[in-house]
Amino acid sequence: MNSILTSVIRADPEYGQLLRATKQDFRANPLPILASGLCEGAADALLVSLLEDTERERGGAALILCPEEKDCVKLGGLLERFGLRTGFYMARDLTFYNMTASHEYEHERIKVLSGLMAGEYDAVLTTPDAALGYTVPPEILKKTTVVINADEPLDLPELAKRLTGAGFVRVDLVDSPGQFALR
């Protein structure tokens, strides 16, 4: 999406040099890119322009590290206004006590990881804490993902076994995510 700000950024000769250098740097394990000294609006326009102009070379989502989660949310909203698909990979909530805890954050994290595997994002925003944390390997996530189609018959005992193996809890009445019931 071209805006006045991204058009001005793209017209700058220094942006052209940065874009060429960035495109040359894409490889199996690309190095991070840091841009500093820009005011907030210019930094946003630079980021949007780079994300749009390197989409083909990236071959996947860009990882954007923000200092805090509130910055991820703010930047994610901005990128979405420019038409970019973003995911927010939040830090894991650690529970040190044996207590019932909401797994809502875990569900959101798995949703982003699944979206990454499916190519649903142009960029994933996260904090250093979240990026450095352990998570499920892609092959295990793919293996444990169950796709249910309304027009296909289900083997209910096999489905229950797979859901239980993936960490879901069988209950009589579902009242929160992570639970399932058979009728």
Language-model features, listed with the residues they occupy:
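ASCE RecA-like P-loop NTPase motor cores
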Residues: M1-R183
